[in-house]
Amino acid sequence: MHMIGEDVSEQLDVIPAVLRVKRIRRPRYGCRSCEGAVVQAKAPSRLVDNGMATTALVTSIVVGKFAWHLPLNRQTHMFRGLGIELDRSTLVHWVLRAAWWLRPLYMLLVDMVLASPKVFCDDTPMPVLDRRRRRTRTARFWSYAVDDRPWQGPAVPIVVYIFAEDRKGQHVHEHLTRFNGVLQVDGYTGYRGLTKPDRPGGAITLAYCLAHARRQFFEVYRKSTSSLAAEALQRIGMVYQIEERIRGLTATERVTVRQSQTKPILEAFKVWLMQCLAEESAKSSLAEAIRYTLNHWDGLMVFLTDGRVEVDSNIVERTIRPIALGRRNALFAGSARGAEAWAILSSIINTAKLHELDPQTYLADVLERIVSGQTKVNSLHELLPWAWKAARAEQMVAAA
């Protein structure tokens, strides 16, 4: 018999995770002719002082929790399956240390977001364990996002989360002390003081979210199948059809289309809303939806004259989803310090995801560079996700 050809097939396989022990040898050298002279290489810096975890292992735990939403107690069970007993408190300590090392990079992201001329903002509850009361209290994560991709703008996409003890409007005012520009938000009343001319940094322009107004009418229609609510949804839908067509155009091009096509639709919508409100019972749910829309009308119309502004704040709402998933699985943060670490690590990981980076590869390299001292504080901008990605691409081209 002789071979006349072959058939080749492929199967996708997996190599399960393997834990290993890295042994670091540091020989000591002595001089027989010198009294008390001993030379030894300095021990490499560790992410956890005197700890047994490598940077790669801590990164794996951090990414598991904040990128893939695996609670730490679940990860301890996974380690047990690999034959390693690790207490949850040990993992907590490692995560806190990772956040400590990454705080300067996080603050750089925060500064970049708040220096932008247009920012999205939203918030979400974050239960935090109060050990004295033996129950949780409801704190907040404020999400600030920049994303100019829908209009080909210059800003790179970034999201940062800032932990606050509650939802008081003062936190937003403190966060935005240096911000001056357009803030795209929902209808939360705590934002209103930001429009005052005498505030530090000057008045902020609030652009409201049309999706929130639409949601008001949708709830009315869902509960009552109101024909007026259905018409409101249809009119708002016309606006979204136009927005879909102009996505990706420049800011100037978007304003041109919005002025010629969207503005007449919304002007007619406002007249229709006022007519409906005059005829509707003041206590009806439809009247409430109409009043909500009219009360926020000026902010809802900002996008007509500014092509950088979106019709809604869905971009920042999408950044809230990873926090919600982690919260659902972990139930709560174990302390205020833990919640702050959650905000730091989620900001860096989710910004990396916006740039289509693998969180494990990116974060392991970044932490290694910071911990080892290879990248100094004044060079942290080199580790920002987009800069790191560009540098990695250049290295791959050079190696090809």
Q: What is each PLM-predicted segment?
A:
Residues 1-4, 17, 32-36:
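Short Cys/His-rich metal-coordination motifs, predominantly Zn2+-binding knuckles/fingers
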Residues 2-8, 40-44:
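Short Cys/His-rich "knuckle" micro-motifs
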Residues 21-400:
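Catalytic center-proximal scaffold of phosphoryl-transfer enzymes
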Residues 7-19:
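Short Cys/His-rich Zn2+-coordinating modules
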Residues 5, 11, 310-312:
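Intrinsically disordered, low-complexity peptide-like regions
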